Each structure stands twice: as structure tokens, then as C-alpha cells.
Amino acid sequence: MATQGFSCLLLSVSEIDLSMKRQYKQIR
């Protein structure tokens, strides 16, 4: 259970990082 939640959290963080990078590229 704990590991599943951790992996889910990691996945969401990586998704946020990707979206942030996309926005950064769009701004520039």
C-alpha cells in the first residue's frame, strides 16, 4: 500500500515537472 502511494506520488511529480518544462518552453 505504502509503496503504491509513493509510486503514485512520484508519477504525479514527474507529470508536473514535464508540464512545467512544456510551459517554460512555450513562454520562451
From Swiss-Prot:
Induction: Expression is not affected following staurosporine (STS) treatment. Down-regulated 6 hours following beta-carotene treatment, remains down-regulated 24 hours following beta-carotene treatment.
Any single GO BP term: negative regulation of execution phase of apoptosis
Keyword set, alphabetical order: Cytoplasm, Secreted
InterPro entries: Humanin
Tissue: Highly expressed in testis. Also expressed in kidney, heart, skeletal muscles and brain.
Subcellular location: Secreted; Cytoplasm
Any Pfam family the entry gives: Humanin
GO MF annotation, one: receptor antagonist activity
Keyword Transferase tagged: no
Segment forming the signal sequence: none
Gene Ontology terms: cellular component: cytoplasm; extracellular region
Family: Belongs to the humanin family.
Protein's job: Plays a role as a neuroprotective and antiapoptotic factor.
Name the UniProt record assigns to this protein: Humanin-like 4
Organism of provenance: Homo sapiens
